[in-house]
Swiss-Prot record:
Pathway: Pigment biosynthesis; betalain biosynthesis. The lineage of its organism: Eukaryota, Viridiplantae, Streptophyta, Embryophyta, Tracheophyta. The gene is CYP76AD1. GO terms for cellular component: membrane. Keywords: Heme, Iron, Membrane, Metal-binding, Monooxygenase, Oxidoreductase, Transmembrane, Transmembrane helix. Disulfide bonds: none annotated. It is found in: Membrane. The chain crosses the membrane at residues 4-24. This is Cytochrome P450 76AD1. Its cofactor is heme.
Length: 497
C-alpha cells in the first residue's frame, strides 16, 4: 500500500469518525439539560467568570434549575434548585455518588488517600466508618465538651482584653484560631496557635491557599490532556501547601512515636491521634492516609467554620435589631453571668435560626465537591450522560425563589416555628450536603458556631471600626471552596455588663 492510499484511508477514517461523533453528539444534546450554546473548542468557559456560583445562578435564571455546560471538553451539569436537589439525593444518589477529580488534588496523590475524593468503594467505606466511629462520633463529641468550652472561654478572654483596650477584633481570625485550637486539642492534645500570635494568621493563610486552589477554575480540568503540564501551576502550589501542613502533623506524630515520649509508656492522651496510630499499627491506615485525612479535617474544620462565623457577625452588624433580639433571648435563658452549655442550645431557637439563615445565604462550601455520573442517569426529565461532572450550587439553592420567600433577604424569622434543619433532609438548605457524601463534621461545626456566637453576643455589644455605616459594609467575597469576605470584618467589642 503506497503512502497516498494510506493517507487517503486515514483521511476518510478521520472525517467519518468525526462526522459520526458529531451526529451522536447532536442526538445526545437533545436529551441534555438546556444551557448556553458552547463555542468551538472552549465551550462555555467564558461563562464561568471569577465567581462561578453567581455566573451559574444567573444562567439558571435563563435556562432553568438544571443546566448543562461544556467546559472545554468536559460536560458539566449544574443543579441550582431545591426540587432538582431533592430528586438527585433521594432517587439518584447512588449512580451520582462518585467524584470528578480536579487536577489540583492529584498533588501528592491526595485524591487516593482521603475520604473526600475517593470513589465509593470498600476503602471509602472503611474511611467513613473510621471517621464516624473513632474520630467524630457523637460519643466522642459529647466526651469533649470540656475542650470546646475551654476554647470558647479563651475566645471570651481575648475579646474581653480587646474591649478593655478599645481594640477591634478581627472576627474571622479570632474564630479561626478558636476552631484550630479546638481541633488540635481534640486530635493532638496540643494548641497550634494563640489569639495574639502570628502563627494563627500563618495557618489561616495556608488553609485558605489550599481551599482557594482546590476551588479555583483550572484549564487542566477543562482540557485533561493539559494535566501533565499543570498550565496554571495550581497543582504545584497545592503540593507545596500540602507539604507544609503535613510537616506540622508529622512533627506532632514523630514526637508521639518517639521512644522517650511519655505517651508511649504507661500514660495515654486518649485523643484522636492515639486512635489513628493504633489503626496504623493494625495496618488499617497508612501514614500517608493519616496525613491526608488530617489535611481534609483541618481544612474543612477551620476555614469553613471561621468563614461562616464571620458572615454571621456581618449579617448581625447590618441588622442590629436582630442582634438585640438574640441578646435578649440569651439573657432570658442564661441571665447575665451563666456561660452557655451545649444543653442550653435547644432553648435558644432564635439563635439557631440566625445560624440557619446564615448557612442558607452563605453556605460553608459554595458548590458541593464535584460528583460524577457512573452511567447515563435521568434527572428532572433530562439525561445526565455517563462521566459528566455534576456541580450542586448551594449558593443558588439557598436563594431559590421557589423554596424561599424573599430569598435574598436575611430573615432568621423564617425558621421560627418550622422543622427545617441542616442535616440533609430539607433540600433548600444543604450547607453540609446530603446522602452518603454528607459532611461528617457537621455536628461539631454546628456546636462550635452556636457556642461562639452565644458567648460573644451574651457578653458584648459590637460596633464597626471607623465611621462606616453598617448598611455600607463591604459584602464582597473571595471565591474558593468556601467564600471568604474580601475585606476582613473588624468589630470593636463593648462589654454589656
Amino acid at each position: 500500500m503506497d503512502h497516498a492510499t494510506l493517507a487517503m484511508i486515514l483521511a476518510i477514517w478521520f472525517i467519518s469518525f468525526h462526522f459520526i461523533k458529531l451526529l451522536f453528539s447532536q442526538q445526545t444534546t437533545k436529551l441534555l439539560p438546556p444551557g448556553p450554546k458552547p463555542l468551538p473548542i472552549i465551550g462555555n468557559i467564558l461563562e464561568v467568570g471569577k465567581k462561578p456560583h453567581r455566573s451559574f445562578a444567573n444562567l439558571a435564571k435563563i435556562h432553568g434549575p438544571l443546566i448543562s455546560l461544556r467546559l472545554g471538553s468536559v460536560t458539566t451539569i449544574v443543579v441550582s434548585s431545591a426540587d432538582v436537589a431533592k430528586e438527585m439525593f433521594l432517587k439518584k444518589d447512588h449512580p451520582l455518588s462518585n467524584r470528578t477529580i480536579p487536577n489540583s488534588v492529584t498533588a501528592g496523590d491526595h485524591h487516593k488517600l482521603t475520604m473526600s475524593w475517593l470513589p465509593v468503594s470498600p476503602k471509602w467505606r472503611n474511611f467513613r466508618k473510621i471517621t464516624a466511629v473513632h474520630l467524630l462520633s457523637p460519643q466522642r463529641l459529647d466526651a469533649c465538651q470540656t475542650f470546646r468550652h475551654a476554647k470558647v472561654q479563651q475566645l471570651y478572654e481575648y475579646v474581653q482584653e480587646c474591649a478593655q483596650k478599645g481594640q477591634a477584633v478581627d472576627i474571622g481570625k479570632a474564630a479561626f484560631t478558636t476552631s484550630l485550637n479546638l481541633l488540635s486539642k481534640l486530635f493532638f492534645s496540643v494548641e497550634l496557635a494563640h489569639h495574639k500570635s502570628h502563627t494563627s494568621q500563618e495557618f489561616k493563610e495556608l488553609i485558605w491557599n489550599i481551599m482557594e486552589d482546590i476551588g479555583k477554575p483550572n484549564y487542566a480540568d477543562y482540557f485533561p490532556i493539559l494535566g501533565c503540564v499543570d498550565p496554571s501551576g495550581i497543582r504545584r502550589r497545592l503540593a507545596c501547601s500540602f507539604d507544609k501542613l503535613i510537616a506540622v502533623f508529622q512533627g506532632i506524630i514523630c514526637e508521639r512515636l518517639a521512644p522517650d515520649s511519655s505517651t508511649t509508656t504507661t500514660t495515654t492522651t486518649d485523643d484522636v491521634l492515639d486512635v489513628l496510630l493504633q489503626l496504623f499499627k493494625q495496618n488499617e491506615l497508612t501514614m500517608g492516609e493519616i496525613n491526608h485525612l488530617l489535611v481534609d479535617i483541618f481544612d474543612a474544620g477551620t476555614d469553613t467554620t471561621s468563614s461562616t462565623f464571620e458572615w454571621v457577625m456581618t449579617e448581625l452588624i447590618r441588622n442590629p435589631e436582630m442582634m438585640e433580639k438574640a441578646q435578649e433571648e440569651i439573657k432570658q435563658v442564661l441571665g447575665k453571668d451563666k456561660q452557655i452549655q451545649e444543653s442550653d442550645i435547644i432553648n435558644l431557637p432564635y439563635l439557631q435560626a440566625i445560624i440557619k439563615e446564615t448557612l442558607r445565604l452563605h453556605p460553608p462550601t459554595v458548590f458541593l465537591l464535584p460528583r460524577k455520573a457512573d452511567t447515563d442517569v435521568e434527572l428532572y426529565g433530562y439525561i445526565v450522560p455517563k462521566d459528566a461532572q455534576i456541580l450542586v450550587n448551594l449558593w443558588a439553592i439557598g436563594r431559590d425563589p421557589n423554596a424561599w420567600q424573599n430569598a435574598d433577604i436575611f430573615s432568621p424569622e423564617r425558621f421560627i416555628g418550622c422543622e427545617i434543619d441542616v442535616k440533609g433532609r430539607d433540600f433548600g438548605l444543604l450547607p453540609f450536603g446530603a446522602g452518603r457524601r454528607i459532611c461528617p463534621g457537621m455536628n461539631l461545626a454546628i456546636r462550635m458556631l452556636t457556642l461562639m456566637l452565644a458567648t460573644l453576643l451574651q457578653f458584648f455589644n459590637w460596633k464597626l471600626e471607623g465611621d462606616i455605616s453598617p448598611k455600607d459594609l463591604d459584602m464582597d467575597e473571595k471565591f474558593g471552596i468556601a467564600l471568604q469576605k474580601t475585606k476582613p470584618l473588624k468589630l470593636i467589642p463593648i462589654p454589656r455588663y
